[in-house]
Amino acid sequence: MKIKSIEPTPSPNTMKVILTEELPAGKSNNYKPEQAEGAPLVIAEILKIDGVKGVYHVADFLAVERNARYDWKDILPQVRTAFGMESAESAEENRSDQESFGEVKVFVQMFSGIPMQVKLTDGEREERFGLPERFQQAILKLRSEASNVVFERAWKEQGVRFGDFDEIGHDVTEELQAAYSDERLKRLTEAAAQGKGEAKQAVQRKAYKVTLDMLDDEDWKKRYAHLEQMDPKEEDIPVLQKALDDPKVSIRRQAVVYLGMIETPDVLPLLYKALEDKAVSVRRTAGDCLSDIGDPQAIPAMIKSLSDSSKLVRWRAAMFLYEVGDESAIEALRAAEDDPEFEVSLQVKMALERIEHGEEAKGSVWKQMTESRKKGE
């Protein structure tokens, strides 16, 4: 068994290693470092590499997952060595204390519709962040008036963010404080304490029509609370356009998330605007949305993002061009080939190789999945 090629995936922390041999149909194996003894020799060697978190083997490829604090430029030569293809150069651990490719998963522990605490994890590290006293008081009231708190508490996933744990924790707790006013907490507490079927419906998130004037409130927490309870539709684009100019980063980022959910061509100019936002988190989110939408009209905007100051934005732009780019991107990709960040440079080279060899763009992973489902219907 040898390596045919190594390709990036939608996650900067996973690489796809294409093999010359294929597993029997329907068979797959998932290996972790602690299971190395029972793994095939080649995979056992890969699991010994510093920074490798796991290997998933299915069909004709391996999905190698890394710890975000380790560089692929140190890991991949050792993966090739495990297959006997070439000797790995001795590489020192190269961890960045600045921006990381690490994906941080965000969870909020809920009790009858009321947030209790925030949990962040990158797969290796976990941190929890508490909420202010008023949230705890609401929980204490329900402990005495409702059923068993252990039974009713549950972790709700809030998606993925990038960056420093403390920064993300601060942002998420601040957003929850804004979204759950004293009035909303009181309403949720009273409804949950009833313990009836209709009460359970009452504590669920209620969407309402957000108007332009609601975003004029001087208190950013009230502006965010309105936006948080929006059910975004195409008719809400003018409101989201206004939110993109809000001085609060959390509001601009939430507006971008909603624009990505709408997905119609009308949102593209606004996502292009968000790609130039002064806040990196907003630009990253805009890039993710454009990648998920996968519209070739975004090629010029993503070409421009190849020179963004954030390596994550540059990586996302290169990934987009790999997925849907055409000949118009070749010049910019050639200029970006020697990006100082290994992951960005690799993704740029992959995009350039696909386009120059005349291979048809496959579209984003989400688009491929959608088309696959349609064919199966």
Swiss-Prot record:
Which one of the record's GO molecular function terms can you name?
Answer: oxidoreductase activity
InterPro entries recorded: ARM-like, ARM-type_fold, Nfu/NifU_N, Nfu/NifU_N_sf, PBS_lyase_HEAT, Virulence_F_dom
Q: Which residues cross the membrane?
A: none
Q: What is the protein name stated in its UniProt record? A: Uncharacterized protein YpgR
Q: Which cysteines are joined by disulfide bonds?
A: none
What SUPFAM superfamilies does the annotation carry? ARM repeat, Hypothetical protein SAV1430
The record ties this protein, via Pfam families, to: HEAT_2, Nfu_N, Virulence_fact
